[in-house]
Amino acid sequence: RSRGLGDVYKRQLMNNMNKRTFLSLLLCVCCLSFLHAERVDMQQAGADVQGRKLNTALINSTIDRLNAHGGGTLFFPAGTYLTGSIHMKSNITLELEAGATLKFSENFDDFLPYVEVRHEGIMMKSFQPLIYAVDAENITIKGEGTLDGQGKAWWTEFFRVLVDLRDNGKRNINKYQPM
């Protein structure tokens, strides 16, 4: 039985409508996924904003929770947030408002246990970096806030160890890396 032009036209129209419907649904799903991404105000979540108490556990547990739900943003309003190593995961944003400071601890114990890192092309075990990620993607750090790595404490210890090694020939140079 032969088909008329009307049948062919109806079939093409249905195919085009199915494609448009599919693309419209896909666009809606994409938009909804962005709307669903949670934004956590770290001050409201209970973080100390005076820089006196460590917020490491709260920051990292918030990252874990957001990551388990597909991602989100940790928002740091103005204040000082003392922390150890921050373990980033996929689809996480750290947003620091102007006047917000992530102040990394001067206590080396807050960057343990050692993790595998690359230094000048050589893989080694060392302290956890200030912000650390493994097998993660779509990570963002944004805003007008400050990341304060407390570099003076780290350089002071580094040079103390070098001087001890040079002057005294010590091999067990600190409690972290006995040689």
Locations of the language-model features?
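Small/flexible residues
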Residues: 3-5, 21-22, 168
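Bacterial Sec-dependent N-terminal signal peptides
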Residues: 11-40
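Extracellular/periplasmic carbohydrate-active domains that bind, remodel
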Residues: 30, 34-179
